[in-house]
Amino acid sequence: MNRDIGKSAERELVSILRSEGFNAVRIPTSNSSPNPLPDIFATKGNILLAIECKSTWEHKVKVKDRQVIKLFEFLSMFTMEGRALIAVKFKEIHKWKVMEIREIKEVEVTVDNSIFLENYISQFLENYIPQAGRELSKL
């Protein structure tokens, strides 16, 4: 992913998360950084999301296991309940889709094996933040 395109996608995702009531921050760092830092982290309630962000015109994106490891290492530094996510802006459909990662391995995120960001947020609010309400703006 081109750096400028990547930065733009990360900023867009942070903006969406903030509009849904998350505290969200983009971490501007290089993939070569030895520190276990996600592209974005977001919190709501006592839940911490570590997010690897991608943007593509293709129908799939591969995420190397070293990027997944960084998400889990980042989450392990905090006592909050953590979730590792891959968020992909599939530009052909003009939508964000996400995949929650539960184990360390190379991951392929496709249009078909991921869920729309708005659906993930809705499920997140229902399952983890029941008192937060369930109304979502259109993404």
Curated annotation (Swiss-Prot):
Q: Which Gene3D superfamilies match?
A: 3.40.1350.10
Q: Which UniProt keywords apply?
A: DNA damage, DNA recombination, DNA repair, DNA-binding, Endonuclease, Hydrolase, Magnesium, Metal-binding, Nuclease
InterPro entries hit by this protein: Hjc (IPR002732), Hjc_arc (IPR014428), Restrct_endonuc-II-like (IPR011335), tRNA_endonuc-like_dom_sf (IPR011856)
**Any idea what a deletion of this gene does?**
Not essential, it can be disrupted. No change in sensitivity to mitomycin C. Double hjc-hje mutants cannot be made, double hje-pina mutants grow more slowly at 55 degrees Celsius (versus 65 or 75 degrees) and do not grow to the same cell density as wild-type.
* Keyword DNA-binding listed: yes
The coenzyme or cofactor needed here is: Mg(2+)
Q: Name one GO molecular function term.
A: metal ion binding
Top-rank taxon of the source lineage equals: Archaea
Positions binding Mg(2+) in this chain are: 10, 39, 52
Chloroplast recorded as keyword: no
Q: What is the top EC class of this enzyme, as a single word? A: hydrolase
Show the catalytic activity: Endonucleolytic cleavage at a junction such as a reciprocal single-stranded crossover between two homologous DNA duplexes (Holliday junction)
Its Enzyme Commission number(s) read 3.1.21.10
Name its GO BP terms in alphabetical order. Answer: DNA recombination; DNA repair
Identify the residue position(s) of the site Transition state stabilizer.
Answer: 54
Biological function? A structure-specific endonuclease that resolves Holliday junction (HJ) intermediates during genetic recombination. Acts only on 4-way DNA junctions in a sequence non-specific manner; introduces paired nicks in opposing strands 2 bases 3' of the point of strand exchange only on continuous strands of 4-way junction DNA. Cleaves both mobile and immobile junctions. Redundant function with Holliday junction resolvase Hjc.
Similarity comment: Belongs to the Holliday junction resolvase Hjc family. Hje subfamily.
Q: How does it assemble?
A: Homodimer.
The miscellaneous remark of the record is:
A second Holliday junction resolving enzyme, Hjc, probbly with different substrate specificity, exists in this organism.
Q: What is this protein called?
A: Crossover junction endodeoxyribonuclease Hje
**Source organism:** Sulfolobus acidocaldarius (strain ATCC 33909 / DSM 639 / JCM 8929 / NBRC 15157 / NCIMB 11770)
